[in-house]
Amino acid sequence: MRTASIKRKTKETDIEVAVNLDGSGVSEVATGIGFFDHMLDLLARHSRIDITVRADGDLHVDHHHTTEDVGIALGQAVKQALGSMVGISRYASVYMPMDETLSRVVIDISGRPVLVFKVGFPRDKIGEFDTELVREWFNAFAVNAGVTLHVETLYGENSHHIAESCFKGLARALRAAVAIDPRAANEVPSTKGQLGG
């Protein structure tokens, strides 16, 4: 089983994250931010990655530190769980509809952290959650997971739908990219013989 646990404690947040890449999509998420919990639940369910997140953050300030630090810890956990990356499919691309919204998510588990994020939100907030934090989370995740990640919303009108299509798109892309390719189960998917540089 490809699993990992990460603990991250700063003056701003105290976070514990665990993942099982070969799970069934079970989630136990408690960040204190309702909308964010909803997105992480979706991520687990649609990636089929078991995800546990417990976060105690300075929510009296705002949601920024908790959202970003969960992205950091979750990215680190995924990277650790991938290990040598032998046998993974590595690449995946997904078009994800959510009612009137359509987003595209493309991932390369390359070891080279890059985020291209072309997503606009018609509103500044979804409930109490600042929409600008969606990008902050994706950036923290991509950098710490060591993945190249392109996220683009082609069109959409509802901020909740836009965010949800991005998280679900990432989930389905991760599900495909971390899957073991049975035709190359003992190979690192790179002509270099290694990933990450």
From Swiss-Prot:
Catalytic activity of the protein: D-erythro-1-(imidazol-4-yl)glycerol 3-phosphate = 3-(imidazol-4-yl)-2-oxopropyl phosphate + H2O
Q: What's the Enzyme Commission number for this chain? A: 4.2.1.19
Query: Entry's InterPro entries?
Result: IGPD_sf, ImidazoleglycerolP_deHydtase, ImidazoleglycerP_deHydtase_CS, Ribosomal_Su5_D2-typ_SF
What GO CC terms are in its UniProt record? cytoplasm
- MF terms (GO), sorted A to Z: imidazoleglycerol-phosphate dehydratase activity
Hey, which pathway is this one from? Amino-acid biosynthesis; L-histidine biosynthesis; L-histidine from 5-phospho-alpha-D-ribose 1-diphosphate: step 6/9
Q: Where in the cell is it found?
A: Cytoplasm
Q: Which UniProt keywords apply?
A: Amino-acid biosynthesis, Cytoplasm, Histidine biosynthesis, Lyase
**EC class of the enzyme, as a word:** lyase
Q: Does the keyword Metal-binding apply?
A: no
Which GO terms of type biological process are on file? L-histidine biosynthetic process
Family statement drawn from the similarity comment of this UniProt entry: Belongs to the imidazoleglycerol-phosphate dehydratase family.
What's the protein name? Imidazoleglycerol-phosphate dehydratase
- Identify the species of origin: Nitrobacter winogradskyi (strain ATCC 25391 / DSM 10237 / CIP 104748 / NCIMB 11846 / Nb-255)
Originating gene: hisB
